[in-house]
Amino acid sequence: MQADDKCTPQPEQRSISTPNRSQQSVPDGWPFRKAKDLFDIQKAIKLDVDSFAEEYNMKRKRRGVALILNHVRFESMPTRNGSVKDATDLQASLSRLGFNVRIYTDPTVKTITTVLQSTSAEDHTDADCLIVVAMSHGESGLLHSTDSLYPVDMLWSPFTGDRCSSLAGKPKLFFIQACRGVQLDKGVKIMHETDSKRNTTYSIPAYADIMVAYSTFDGFYSWRNPDSGSWFIQALCEELDLHGRSRDLLTLMTFVNRRVAIEYQSYVPENEKFHAKKQIPSIVSMLTRLVYFPDKHTSALDDINDGSKEKESKVREKVT
């Protein structure tokens, strides 16, 4: 979003305590319009969910599309061994929840742009939500494709409420497995002591209903095992398989964080710099309701073996 450079600061306004908070709240010295005024210039989008509902409606005909952008090979960077396993495992986990999974291996920036724009242009009216997963080498705010760098926000910008109306008011979930810098987490040792009938129209921010889950905190390395896959994606698959239909998404992601933080540690004894290092995922949520994935009873892959995957957390690790 861009700020209007013609705006000028307004005099300081005193806040008055009142039950109607929306009428008294003001931005920090910038001109604004009340939310109800926006309906004069913006066509309202009809949603089959009450503005006061605590959960997203996840009972539509389709669960939705899940895009997986799996960057494995690069022109001038190491091959991301283990990422194919991540993509395969994640496809199985998401298919079990009813998603239409589409995998793109080693896409160029041009291909990524085309895929995102064409998916945004689809009619998602009968879909519950959208998922986009990107797995690659990365830097802070940037991801590497086969041929170039691209900004991470390119993943969600085509799907904001003002650009993809059929997904407005629905959860749009983004999972990013990539480094976000070169810092290493040494870790800290812990010693344990003992249905509504309201027919109202309302507006929502364009960036509402988005969640971005990063594999690591900004500025830090993200870890991947060449044989068993990346820590973050494997932990995500395990939690989706075990609790994908019972826990709300943010609770589930908290347990993904716990798995990565506690169950994993790098093992590179011949290189002290990279040995015995830790990782913690980072979640940015603009969700406005709880996200659940109830059983659709329609997925063709419901019969996939739901067994848990073994993890080898103390084997040679490589940085994503």
Language-model features: locations:
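Cysteine endopeptidase catalytic domains of the caspase/legumain-like
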Residues: 1-320
